[in-house]
């Protein structure tokens, strides 16, 4: 047997905070060494933090990374352990995203990333160059300060692996695993048995299985030990890096770290037998044949042994059941951990939420409640960093600290019901009930006086006073009156957030939380600069459909039973007067359902459908219930209002990224914000197709016509009804 103990980790790094990042790196190495591990893998760009963005273009960022690495190598941190450290490196005129492989106070080699992530939220090609020289390793001259301190002038640089006496180890960096021809396939044929994947991978609902399947698939047919490390937490932007460090052996997960956690450092250890890798490879004929004619990959020889022989005191790690969270748990824990990092790192003393008693703001309140529960649980487990942060934020003194989530919420969470003459007693009651269940400090504010003052000023200036639609007013008057209420709520929210701590003799300031969902952003069903305008928004990238399922789950699992009643209530903005024959409803106002909006959103973003492609595909999805002409009207109606309201996305509050069809304007969904909302060419093409059908409908087999399967598209213009979403 060749027994090998390896360690990987989740680290809660913060972009550009070299001091705290180094503290976490050192803690993870110390824990790995204490457990007897001889390999330690850290996350991608762990020294600087993955999310530095344009700070990567600054020479200071690279210089400081080298200074931090020098500090590690001058100490005993790398003694008797191979450490993979992620940091940017400049070679010549190019900047590379690198894993620096160190051992015994020396740099063994530097492995630059070859395939960069450049889609979705990723933009690595803006800051880094992909390494394309695969033939052989080059010599890299270390910076003068580093070479003098380490007494090491140069190191191998490029694509290759480390050949120890008893095994071979190589790095594979994040996106490379998901490329069409991943490096681990070629490296395995060259005899590499241990793969180290340093990653900066962010959370997205229902995404984890894709990642884990890739790890397992990498070693299922080729054999090997696959180590994965990731950041965990908010490192300064809309993304939450969701950890889940893991170790996979021959396709089986033998260790898995948490996906959501408040901890700064989490190290997982595994004891593996490399002979099991050799045995599997020797049993696969095709592997043997391909290995015999492999393309040779360069290596660096290290005269050192990593493994131990048969030893009954060393227990092998066994395959474990993979832990997956439900989407409802992901909505609870991901944004809760993200908000905790934002709160403790911003210097704020708490949150303020305009709580209307509706589904969206109640979801945000529940997530804050979940955050408070997680804080108390982590303190009970003995996490001193969480305890110190909670004591500062909650203004605890005399040895006290949070032991009850409701008591902690009372210290850090204000909720405000900003009612008007258009608000119902039901939403007012539900708002107060939920706040009490969470433990928030709740206020009930009537905004009628403020709205009336604004209207009086308008009447003084113009000589006219607008009326609601139900009172005979025009659409322009009706919309203007609704927007006044919404915008006054934003002004009051920020005023209360800045002054309530002063009123209650508390230090600091409060962050205002927004509560618009992804579907409302897509449709533009929100007032520009209303309560959707806040400091941060934990649900801005989550669909209404998912939020309603979350509310049902949270009513029981978070202990907030009023959420069940809130979920069952029809969504309403309560910005128009309630009459016996009229009550404002969101879906009526929008002219489409939230379920339809989810479909439009997925087709527009995930499957890259323009108006014509969306129409064609929806003819298949909705063909049993709607005629092509009816589908055409729905598609045109959506694109009309999407384009009219697109400008609102440019100023929307920074939101937690959770959904693959988010219309978030900062990076994920880059589009113009001035459209011809009539879409004359595209809508004309749709009309021509409808006319050419002569009233025909889509022909479905009987079993498909009666089924309720998902949308039948794989890409724009696919037109394939058998392809499921």
Curated annotation (Swiss-Prot):
One GO molecular-function entry: NAD+ synthase (glutamine-hydrolyzing) activity
Keyword Cytoplasm assigned: no
SUPFAM superfamilies according to UniProt: Adenine nucleotide alpha hydrolases-like, Carbon-nitrogen hydrolase
SS bond list: none
The keyword Membrane is annotated on this UniProt entry: no
InterPro entries: C-N_Hydrolase, C-N_Hydrolase_sf, Gln-dep_NAD_synthase, NAD/GMP_synthase, NAD_synthase, Rossmann-like_a/b/a_fold
Record-linked PANTHER family: GLUTAMINE-DEPENDENT NAD(+) SYNTHETASE, NH 3 /GLUTAMINE-DEPENDENT NAD + SYNTHETASE
Family from the record: In the C-terminal section; belongs to the NAD synthetase family.
Protein's recorded name: Glutamine-dependent NAD(+) synthetase
């Amino acid at each position: 047997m060749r027994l090998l103990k390896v360690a990987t980790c989740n680290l809660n790094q913060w972009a550009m905070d070299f001091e705290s990042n180094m503290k976490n790196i050192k803690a993870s190495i110390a824990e790995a060494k204490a457990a007897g591990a001889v390999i330690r893998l850290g996350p991608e760009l762990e020294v600087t933090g993955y999310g530095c963005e344009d700070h990567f273009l600054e020479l200071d960022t690279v210089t400081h990374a080298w200074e931090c690495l020098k500090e590690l190598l001058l100490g005993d941190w790398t003694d008797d352990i191979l450490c993979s450290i992620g940091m940017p490196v400049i070679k010549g005129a190019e900047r590379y995203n690198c894993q620096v492989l160190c051992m015994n106070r020396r740099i063994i080699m530097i492995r630059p990333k070859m395939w960069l992530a450049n889609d979705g939220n990723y933009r690595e090609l803006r800051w880094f160059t992909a390494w394309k020289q695969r033939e052989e390793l080059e010599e890299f001259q270390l910076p003068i300060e580093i070479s003098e301190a380490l007494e090491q002038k140069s190191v191998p640089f490029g694509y290759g692996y480390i050949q120890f006496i008893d095994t071979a180890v190589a790095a594979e960096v994040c996106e490379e695993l998901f490329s069409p021809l991943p490096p681990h396939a070629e490296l395995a044929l060259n005899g590499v048995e241990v793969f180290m994947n340093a990653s900066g991978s962010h959370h997205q609902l229902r995404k984890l299985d894709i990642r884990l399947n890739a790890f397992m698939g990498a070693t299922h047919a080729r054999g090997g030990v696959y180590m994965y490390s990731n950041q965990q937490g908010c490192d300064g932007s809309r993304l939450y890096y969701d950890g889940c460090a893991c170790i996979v052996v021959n396709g089986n997960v033998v260790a898995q770290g948490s996906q959501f956690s408040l901890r700064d450092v989490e190290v997982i250890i595994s004891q593996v037998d490399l002979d099991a890798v050799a045995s599997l490879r020797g049993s696969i004929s095709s592997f043997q044949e391909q290995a015999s004619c492999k393309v040779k990959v360069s290596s660096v020889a290290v005269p050192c042994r990593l493994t131990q022989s048969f030893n009954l005191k060393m227990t092998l790690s066994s395959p474990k059941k993979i832990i997956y969270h439900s989407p409802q748990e992901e909505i609870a824990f991901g944004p809760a951990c993200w908000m905790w990092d934002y709160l403790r790192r911003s210097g704020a003393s708490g949150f303020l939420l305009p709580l209307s008693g509706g589904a969206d703001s109640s979801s945000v309140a529940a997530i804050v409640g979940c955050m408070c529960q997680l804080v108390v649980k982590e303190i009970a487990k003995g996490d001193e960093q969480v305890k110190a942060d909670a004591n500062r934020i909650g203004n605890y003194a005399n040895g006290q600290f949070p032991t009850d989530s409701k008591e902690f919420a009372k210290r850090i969470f204000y909720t405000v019901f900003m009612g008007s003459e258009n608000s119902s007693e039901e939403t007012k009651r539900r708002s107060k009930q939920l706040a009490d269940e969470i433990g928030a400090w709740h206020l009930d504010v009537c905004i009628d006086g403020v709205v009336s003052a604004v209207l009086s000023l308008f009447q003084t200036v113009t000589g006219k006073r607008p009326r609601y639609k139900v009172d005979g007013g025009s659409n322009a008057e009706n919309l203007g009156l609704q927007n006044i209420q919404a915008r006054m709520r934003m002004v009051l929210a920020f005023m209360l957030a800045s002054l309530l701590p002063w009123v209650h003799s508390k230090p600091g300031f409060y962050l205002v939380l927004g509560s618009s969902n992804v579907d409302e952003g897509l449709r533009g069903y929100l007032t520009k600069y209303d309560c959707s305008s806040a400091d941060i928004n934990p649900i801005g990238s989550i669909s209404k459909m998912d939020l309603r399922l979350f509310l049902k789950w949270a009513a029981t699992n978070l202990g907030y039973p009023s959420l069940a009643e809130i979920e069952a209530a029809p969504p309403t903005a309560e910005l128009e007067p309630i009459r016996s024959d009229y009550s404002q409803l969101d879906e009526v106002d929008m002219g489409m359902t939230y379920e339809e909006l989810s479909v439009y959103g997925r087709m527009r973003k995930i499957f890259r459908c323009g108006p014509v492609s969306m129409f064609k595909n929806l003819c298949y999805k909705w063909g049993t219930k709607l005629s092509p002409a009816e589908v055409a009207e729905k598609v045109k109606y959506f694109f009309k209002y999407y384009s009219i309201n697109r400008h609102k996305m440019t100023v929307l509050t920074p939101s937690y990224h959770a959904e693959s069809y988010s219309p978030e304007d900062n990076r994920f969904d880059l589009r113009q914000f001035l459209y011809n909302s009539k879409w004359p060419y595209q809508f004309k093409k749709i009309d021509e197709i409808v006319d050419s059908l002569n009233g025909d409908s889509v022909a479905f087999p009987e079993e498909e016509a009666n089924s309720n399967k998902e949308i039948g598209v794989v890409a724009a213009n696919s037109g394939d009804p058998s392809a499921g979403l």
